[in-house]
Curated annotation (Swiss-Prot):
Keywords: ATP-binding, Cytoplasm, Glycolysis, Kinase, Nucleotide-binding, Transferase
Positions that bind ATP: K203, G294, E325, G354, G355, D356, S357
Protein name: Phosphoglycerate kinase
Record GO cellular component, one term: cytosol
Primary localisation category: cytoplasm
Matching Gene3D superfamilies: Phosphoglycerate kinase, N-terminal domain
Species, as recorded: Chlorobium phaeovibrioides (strain DSM 265 / 1930) (Prosthecochloris vibrioformis (strain DSM 265))
Catalytic activity line of the entry: (2R)-3-phosphoglycerate + ATP = (2R)-3-phospho-glyceroyl phosphate + ADP
Pathway: Carbohydrate degradation; glycolysis; pyruvate from D-glyceraldehyde 3-phosphate: step 2/5
Molecular functions (GO terms): ADP binding; ATP binding; phosphoglycerate kinase activity
Database matches in Pfam families: PGK
Family (UniProt): Belongs to the phosphoglycerate kinase family.
Length: 397
């Protein structure tokens, strides 16, 4: 997917309208608790400002449901960004309207303003053409650097591209496409995919698309129990999708037909209930008892998965191995993160597909040891499913 990027346009003296993903978590005092998404956008922001561009940033924050709600104002983000780039960031009162237009036209080279939350207007998520046209009028060129919303056809990601002469990808989207695209198109082999999470239903399309690309698939998380039940094993009170048993068998069959090594856990960590105080023990998947639930992969499985990871040249991970939020059931997820960090050090390309896996890697303190951590959970999942992302498809080739 070759798209024009920030490097292909002349920035000096131009009003550059850039869609970023500043949807950051805030606490009750409205302080930003994790500024990763702002930091991820800095390379594009700095490039535009250093080259004398006049930058207009736009983003959504939270789910204000199309109404103005001060709780979801981007003002704290403007303050944080200003601190990070050591430059004043003007905060607009709205994202469209005469006053906003006047402020945009008044920007000088190297100055930056942030528009107020796009989702204060229902037209944003409805991809309303009039709203998109009004946004487009603010800039002379459009840059999309919001990978996290690239799978949504919204006014600021897809609609806007119909009203601007130039629409290119920012550096973050370029980086996402480079790593995720290379993994799917020209991976160094062996290529191992690790899939976790609670439900097969959320990962069917990913599995079916990855079966065309990978050599080995390692499966963890509660979705293993749907496979086990389909295979006739006791699953106790573990989470099972009873309406997906046939599907589980067909996925196993597909893997076999394609000569893909698909590994399921040999043992799990079982407990009578999901709680931090519950007694737990490792048990073979063939010996799980009726009143028990499996909540993590066990030590034998960790070792087997570790060997596969360390023997790989490309590793893609999406979804935790267990309930890593509770220490008793976090070993599997952290062991996978550690094995991936080791594999990276040995020269493998390691890619984390956003969401819970990214949170787990951060919690393990290993984020800097991975080749690439995707910033978009839903967007990276759809990309891995082989779907076209509207926000990226709409950019200039």
């Amino acid at each position: 997917m070759q798209k024009k990027t920030l490097s292909d346009i002349t920035i000096q003296g131009k009003r550059i309208l850039m869609r970023v993903d500043f949807n950051v978590p805030l606490n009750d005092e409205r302080e930003i608790t994790d500024d990763k998404r702002i930091v991820e956008a800095l390379p594009s922001i700095r490039k535009i400002l250093d080259n004398g561009g006049r930058l207009i940033l736009m983003s959504h924050l939270g789910r204000p449901k199309g109404k103005v709600n001060p709780i979801f104002s981007l003002a704290p983000v403007a303050a944080k960004l200003s601190e990070l780039i050591d430059t004043p960031v003007a905060m607009a009162e709205d994202c469209i309207g005469t006053e906003v237009m006047q402020s945009a036209l008044a920007l000088q080279d190297g100055e930056v303003m942030l528009l107020e939350n796009l989702r204060f207007h229902p037209e944003e998520e409805a991809n309303d053409p009039e709203f998109a046209k009004e946004l487009a009028a603010l800039g002379e060129m459009y840059v999309n650097d919001a990978f996290g919303t690239a799978h949504r056809a919204h006014a600021s990601t897809e609609g806007i591209t119909h009203f601007v002469p130039t629409a290119v990808a920012g550096y973050l989207i370029e980086k996402e496409l480079m790593y995720l695209g290379k993994a799917l198109e020209k991976p160094e082999r062996p290529f191992v995919a690790i899939l976790g999470g609670s439900k097969i239903s959320g990962k069917i399309d990913v599995l079916e698309n990855l079966f065309k690309k990978v050599d080995t698939v390692l499966i963890g998380g509660a979705m293993v129990f749907t496979f086990f039940k389909a295979m006739g094993l006791e699953t106790g009170s573990s989470l099972v999708e009873d309406n997906k048993l046939e599907l589980a068998l067909s996925l196993l069959e597909q893997a076999k037909n394609r000569n893909i090594k698909l590994l399921l856990p040999q043992d799990v960590i079982a407990a009578p209930e999901l709680s931090a105080d519950a007694p737990f023990h490792a048990v073979s998947v063939k010996e799980l008892e009726a009143g028990e639930m499996g909540l993590d992969i066990g030590p034998l499985t960790i070792e087997a998965y570790r060997q596969e990871i360390l023997g790989a040249r490309t590793i893609l991970w999406n979804g935790p191995m267990g309930v890593f939020e509770i220490d008793s059931f976090a070993n599997g997820t952290f062991a996978v993160a550690e094995a991936m960090a080791l594999a990276t050090a040995k020269g493998a390309t390691t890619i984390i597909g956003g969401g819970d896996s990214a949170a787990a890697v951060a919690k393990a303190g290993l984020a800097s040891k991975m080749t690439h951590i995707s910033t978009g959970g839903g967007a990276s999942l759809e990309f891995l499913e082989g779907k076209e992302l509207p926000g990226i498809a709409a950019l200039n080739d």
